[in-house]
């Protein structure tokens, strides 16, 4: 409509060569980046395309490359986004998925690691979200060995007991109900 140029990033432009518990290394092949080695500092596969999109956006914003390609790639590697598929301790990943797409991406990420790791889910939700649908999606597409439900602070909480009841409808995994979020985290780490 406005005549703005579009710059697509396709998954085929990204060749993943190494995955770890903290990052995904890939080669980017588009624009100024021909076989450029990039590290997306996240466990989630969708962050490869997001990182590539950020680099391509920099090409559009800074076509003279006043910010060097090396600096751009280093900035991607050093990116921190708290609570978004963030590895906070070895084997402990925090994700604040808050909508249907976020849950879908969370599920894909869990599916990519559940063959290698025992999955213990620490879960809470806010009252205005469709948490039953979220729980159903998670339980129908992943295999957690245990679920710890807790409550966030504030007036938007869903009681932990209510969340436990919903989980019990969709999974046979062990369910632990702990309203105190700190105790819930500690409990999840011991399961």
What is the meaning of each model-derived region?
Residues 28-38, 167-176:
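A polyampholytic, Gly/Pro-enriched intrinsically disordered region
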Residues 4-9, 86, 93, 176-178:
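General small-molecule cofactor/ligand-binding pocket signal
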Residues 92-93, 135-191:
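C-terminal helical cap/extension that packs against the catalytic core
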Residues 30-146:
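Nucleotide phosphate-binding/pyrophosphate-handling subdomain across enzymes
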């Amino acid at each position: 409509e406005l005549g703005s140029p579009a710059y697509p990033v396709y998954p085929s432009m990204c060749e993943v060569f190494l995955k770890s518990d903290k990052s995904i290394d890939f080669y980017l092949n588009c624009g100024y980046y021909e076989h450029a080695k990039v590290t997306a500092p996240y466990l989630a596969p969708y962050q490869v395309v997001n990182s590539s999109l950020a680099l391509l956006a920099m090409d559009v914003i800074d076509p003279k490359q006043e910010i060097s390609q090396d600096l751009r790639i280093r900035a991607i590697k050093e990116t921190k986004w708290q609570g978004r598929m963030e590895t906070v301790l070895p084997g402990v990943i925090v994700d604040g998925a808050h909508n249907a797409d976020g849950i879908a991406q969370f599920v894909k990420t869990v599916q990519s690691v559940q063959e290698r790791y025992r999955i213990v889910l620490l879960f809470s939700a806010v009252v205005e979200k469709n948490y039953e649908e979220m729980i159903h999606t998670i339980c129908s597409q992943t295999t957690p060995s245990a679920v710890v439900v807790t409550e966030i602070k504030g007036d938007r909480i869903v009681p932990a007991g209510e969340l436990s009841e919903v989980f019990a409808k969709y999974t046979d995994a062990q369910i632990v109900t702990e309203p105190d979020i700190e105790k819930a985290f500690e409990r999840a780490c011991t399961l």
